[in-house]
């Protein structure tokens, strides 16, 4: 990207309006420009025909619409898409689209790598490099909409839901994530409702409080254990923000909207957190919490110490929670044949925490040996 130009993907509608006013342009031009970028999916100013030639020339001189580069695309047997996206810094992130009968969910990354080191997650094993910009977050949505479109013009409505559940802890990149989610929910952009944008967090409590105040999106909490002792092992941030504090916040998170519930994600690990006593502890923990539970069959990755719970064990765990009035579903594993399932996203990270370089080499060697065909995109998006 030209360092002298501003990337318009970093701007929400109000910011774009202020920018154009500062450039001595009419404020209404912001709506036209914003719609061209996000609704129509155009990044060539010359094609924005209702802006006027003078403004188009000015935009070409002062601004750009700079997107991540699609390095590779994989499509699962179940229809799941995974894109490997290269950033300007040279690192890569992954974005996943999961199609279903009545909706299409895009799983978006918020960081290059992750610093939280959850023991069952592939991303965590690579360490952390940096936060993504607003442009790099919303750029994932832009590119997915373009790639899923049946034509090369208007962005279709195949993406009905966005989940901030890709690489990284979204709340540790608070400002950029909230800015990107606001663009997703803007009727002049992607027009997603607040219930169709979900942020998943491991429980960064101060930022959860901030999110509650400034953004109406759905909340998912990566719980994975019913006791502090076990959660300290699986989700180390629990040592800083223990369950008592986390659950207290979740109880009042949607106090002004009593019909909304917090989703608790619970990965099922064989012999670790899947026993009847764990279900009993979870029932006690979630008492009087407006909750629904999403049981996630563990998706293995190279060098992991964990195994997936059996179907019978998962079903028994679910049934026990349901018997005690907790709305519980088991997530259907999607895209695991292309390492696109929950906990498997890896990308390519230049780790600034120096964590497990050997793990990275073995991981990517293993991915190559799977011989899953990569379709290299030759289309230039910028």
Curated annotation (Swiss-Prot):
Which residues does the record give as [4Fe-4S] cluster binding sites? Answer: 114, 118, 121
Instruction: Give an example GO biological process.
Output: tRNA methylation
Q: Which residues form the Radical SAM core domain?
A: 100-336
Cofactor remark from the record: Binds 1 [4Fe-4S] cluster. The cluster is coordinated with 3 cysteines and an exchangeable S-adenosyl-L-methionine.
Write the record's keywords in alphabetical order, separated by commas. Answer: 4Fe-4S, Cytoplasm, Disulfide bond, Iron, Iron-sulfur, Metal-binding, Methyltransferase, rRNA processing, S-adenosyl-L-methionine, Transferase, tRNA processing
Q: Where is the active site?
A: 94, 342
Q: Name one Pfam family in it.
A: Radical_SAM
Gene Ontology CC entries for this record: cytoplasm
Cofactor(s) required, per the database record: [4Fe-4S] cluster
Q: Known NCBIfam families for this protein?
A: rRNA_mod_RlmN (TIGR00048)
Q: Give the free-text miscellaneous remark of the entry.
A: Reaction proceeds by a ping-pong mechanism involving intermediate methylation of a conserved cysteine residue.
Q: What does this protein do?
A: Specifically methylates position 2 of adenine 2503 in 23S rRNA and position 2 of adenine 37 in tRNAs. m2A2503 modification seems to play a crucial role in the proofreading step occurring at the peptidyl transferase center and thus would serve to optimize ribosomal fidelity.
Give the protein's recorded name. Dual-specificity RNA methyltransferase RlmN
Organism, per UniProt?
Answer: Legionella pneumophila (strain Paris)
